[in-house]
Design a protein with these regions (language model features):
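Generic recognition of stable, solvent-exposed alpha-helical segments in well-folded globular domains
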Residues: 8, 12, 47, 64, ...
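Short, isolated positions in well-ordered beta-strands
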Residues: 128, 519, 725-728
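Second RecA-like catalytic domain
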Residues: 182, 188-189, 194, 236, ...
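Short polar/acidic secondary-structure junctions
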Residues: 35, 224, 526, 733-735
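Extended active-site and interfacial segments that coordinate phosphate-rich ligands
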Residues: 59-74, 238-246, 250-251, 255, ...
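P-loop NTPase motor module signature
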Residues: 1-372
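A positional "C-terminalness" feature that preferentially activates on distal terminal regions of long
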Residues: 471-505, 524, 559-565, 570-775
């Protein structure tokens, strides 16, 4: 078996080897997704590294193979590094398994040491000498940009050097478009051709066709290894590229423009020595080159490791920190990978595979996306989500050529959805299948051409959808819906995996996201100009700003329901609500610092069973002690009447040492009510099943001391008057207007009652009044 980092390479190399073998061509085959081209007679099988990793699930010891060749190992992508680590463990257990690692530019010493001092075989390539010159920008770098300097150097080569094709390396697609336009105006002796990953296939093919004039190919680092540009004599290298780095703490993929390694510089310069002696002009100093890293940081040290860790757990490979990676990833990245998988429900707290995890590991996609598929089965929208999931796992199929941007935008607008970029992807899929009842490659090409879509990516989309559909269909509990899934159900499914890309609008296209980070909706999104208060994004990319590449409007309660276990809940202003008989509170809900709800009135003990003890205290204190309980409760009415009776004695005698205080009343109920009584409803249920005799207060429970009857006789309830008795009210509240004794004179007696009647107080207060008057 021979692995290649890309499908196109696996196909083309297998075809070339088959052609070289002539009559033995049947011994060669290839395996790429569902386009398998091998038979029982196949002895040499070419495949992507991802395909071989998939085979490990059913053939962990690679019994089908006598030897494995890992080609293009210098690319050090996630699959290659994981595969090398895995093969390290298998070579030790299978002495008959031969392993060959091939590459044009790798650290041979590191690879040899990792594989127990494996022999190194060096094969001289068919290359010619390359002259390296260094030409850093003149003056301060703020005075002239790398793009301007690149254009100047290229124009000078065209004017002063012998004719020949030129390859320019620039870091971004935007740079390439700008450079191409400027060079077309300055250099008339050459054909100017762009080359980058999102370029349409027909435009990419132009670099391989003969031209009447020498060509200048303006490329990203795709021309380092992915595409071999023929006929190059000159290379102009800015030494820059966009290098993706996953930031574990913020869970963001960053794509800064950064300096490439020495190995990448040498890979670029080598492109000028394929057909004869060449020249490479590096637009930086030799000291700059000497100070660069010898090799590019392996992808495994700058990527999200969730998918790798999930596969390792599935294959029972043990602790990733002890796995024999050639260059081990950071422990923080491993911890973040585990945390992500636990949040998605793929692993339990002991890092063991869950039922969700087993399903997710069977899908050749990011765990975030496979989790979405599982959720869609619950929401009866599996048909739509498998389409969207397959689209999210590949590059966006929509093309926007520089020369026809307006036409492309108009074509894409046909599929737009004002609320969701994900629905736009679904519309593209449905649009193709609506226009083409039966599948054919010619129909797909026509559809892509008419709608400015990449044929290659649409083909990848169809292939991956078929693969995911087969995997899901094998699951007995998974059912594809026949009726269209609703917008809500589709996006609630998406939230199961994409919740971390949620945000609330601050202003315009700026959103407040989780963990106190801000992000913008990408300008290419249909929601960029007009979006709702709450959105989810498909993925985050950080360039000049942090962008959500795709977006969709959502309701905040969908987000909360999807992330209940991850949300933090806090309560304030806990109080008893007399009308409902419940203990209520103001609730605040936050998801990683993002406030989903604030001051929401909720039934406090019902929100969390941990709230029951404190809710019980509030209920006893405010409903029972503070007399706010309503409804028919015999014990409560009796207790209230008894307490009120003896409190009146306290007011008459002007002392507070007769009736127990509120704390003692609280303790009385707290000792007698069980822990599960925390509101009027639970109290009613308790009384119904257990009676209320144990809740009735006796005078012994209420009184601190029993006052003398003779003392109380000095405080009569009524004042004798000529026509009828006048009621008296006693209050012991010093400093208040009604402190003392108040005569409650009926309105019809006000004019008929002589004032001197009130000169004499009740007997119990005469001594106090006399003392006051003497003073």
């Amino acid at each position: 078996g021979c692995t290649q980092p890309r499908r196109i390479a696996a196909t083309s190399v297998s075809e070339w080897v088959a052609e070289e073998l002539g009559e033995y061509r049947k011994l060669v085959g290839s395996k790429i997704s569902f386009r398998d081209k091998y038979t029982t007679a196949t002895r040499i099988k070419f495949m992507t590294d991802g395909e071989l990793l998939e085979e490990l699930k059913n053939d962990p010891f690679l019994r089908k193979y006598r030897g494995v060749i890992v080609d293009e190992a210098h690319e050090r992508n996630l699959n290659i590094d994981f595969l090398l680590g895995y093969l390290h463990t298998r070579v030790a257990k299978r002495k008959d398994l031969k392993l060959i690692i091939t590459s044009a530019t790798i650290d041979t010493e590191a690879f040899s040491s990792h594989f127990h001092r494996a022999p190194v075989v060096t094969i001289e390539g068919r290359t010619y000498p390359v002259e390296i010159t260094y030409s850093p920008p003149p003056g301060d770098e703020n005075e002239i940009s790398y793009l301007e300097h690149c254009i100047d150097v290229t124009a000078e080569i065209c004017a002063t050097r012998p004719p020949g094709d030129i390859l320019l390396f620039l870091p971004t697609e935007k740079d390439i478009r700008s450079c191409t336009e400027i060079l077309k105006g300055r250099v008339k002796t050459h054909s100017i051709l762009p080359l980058f990953g999102r370029l349409q296939a027909k435009d990419q093919r132009l670099i391989f066709k003969p031209h009447k004039k020498p060509k200048i190919v303006v490329a990203t680092n795709v021309a380092e290894t992915s595409v071999t540009v023929p006929g190059i004599r000159y290379v102009v290298d800015t030494g820059l590229a966009r290098i993706g780095t996953y930031h574990a703490r913020s869970r963001t993929m960053r794509l800064p423009i950064a300096k490439i390694s020495q190995a990448s510089c040498n890979q670029r310069s080598g492109r000028s020595g394929r057909i004869g002696p060449g020249t490479c002009v590096r637009l930086f100093s030799e000291d700059d080159f000497d100070g660069r890293e010898p090799f590019t940081t392996p992808e495994i040290q700058r990527s999200n490791l969730a998918e790798v860790i999930l596969q390792m757990v599935t294959l029972n490979l043990g602790d990733p920190r002890l796995f024999p990676f050639l260059d081990p990833p950071r422990r923080g990245a491993i911890s973040e990978g585990f945390r992500t998988l636990k949040e998605l429900g793929a692993l339990d707290s002991e890092h063991r595979l869950t039922s969700y995890g087993r399903i997710m590991s069977s899908m050749p996609i990011d765990p975030v996306i496979s989790r979405i598929i599982i959720e869609a089965n619950k929401f009866d929208c599996l048909a739509e989500i498998v389409v969207i999931a397959a689209a999210l796992a590949i590059q966006d199929p929509r093309m926007r050529p520089a020369e026809s941007e307006h036409q492309a935008d108009e074509a894409h607008r046909r599929f737009a959805d004002p609320n969701s970029d994900f629905m736009a992807l679904l519309n593209i899929w449905n649009g193709y299948h609506k226009d083409n009842r039966g599948f054919s490659w010619s129909a797909l090409k026509k559809f892509c051409l008419h709608n400015y879509l990449s044929f290659q990516r649409m083909r990848e989309w169809l292939d991956l959808h078929e693969q995911l559909h087969r995997i899901v269909s094998r699951r007995r509990k998974f059912r594809f819906n026949r009726e269209p899934g609703s917008y809500e159900n589709i996006h609630r499914s998406l939230l199961a995996g994409l919740f971390r890309q949620s945000g609330r609008k601050k202003k315009g296209s700026l959103y407040q996201g989780l963990s106190n980070r801000e992000f913008y909706i990408f300008p290419g999104s249909y929601l960029h100009a007009k979006s709702g208060e709450w959105i989810i994004g498909g993925s985050f990319i950080e360039t000049s700003r942090l962008f959500a590449l795709s977006a969709a409007n959502i309701e905040v309660d969908w987000l909360e329901k999807s992330c209940t276990k991850l949300c933090s809940y806090s309560w304030s202003n806990v109080r008893y609500h007399k009308k409902s008989g419940r203990v209520m509170a103001d609730e605040t809900v936050a998801l990683r610092g993002l406030i989903l709800a604030a001051s929401r009135i909720v039934n406090y003990p019902k929100r969390n069973e941990k709230n029951i003890p404190s809710a019980r205290q509030v209920f006893i204190r405010e409903a029972l002690v503070d007399h706010q309980l309503s409804g028919r409760f015999g014990f409560f009415s009796k207790n209230l009447a008894t307490i009120k009776k003896w409190q009146e004695s306290e007011h008459k005698l002007r002392r507070k040492d007769i009736v127990i205080d509120d704390e003692a009343i609280f303790d009385f109920y707290a000792r007698r009510l069980p822990e599960n009584v925390f509101d009027r409803s639970t109290l009613k249920s308790h009384v119904k099943h257990h009676g209320d005799s144990h809740l009735c207060m006796t005078e012994k429970d209420i009184l601190l001391r029993l006052p003398e009857d003779k003392d109380l006789l000095d405080f009569p309830p009524h004042l004798p008057a000529p026509h009828e008795q006048i009621a008296l009210r006693y209050r012991f509240e010093p400093g208040t207007p009604d402190d003392g004794v108040t005569a409650l004179v009926p309105e019809h007696l006000v004019d008929r009652t002589p004032p001197e009647l009130f000169d004499w107080l009740v007997p119990g207060l005469i001594v106090e009044k006399t003392t006051y008057l003497i003073k």
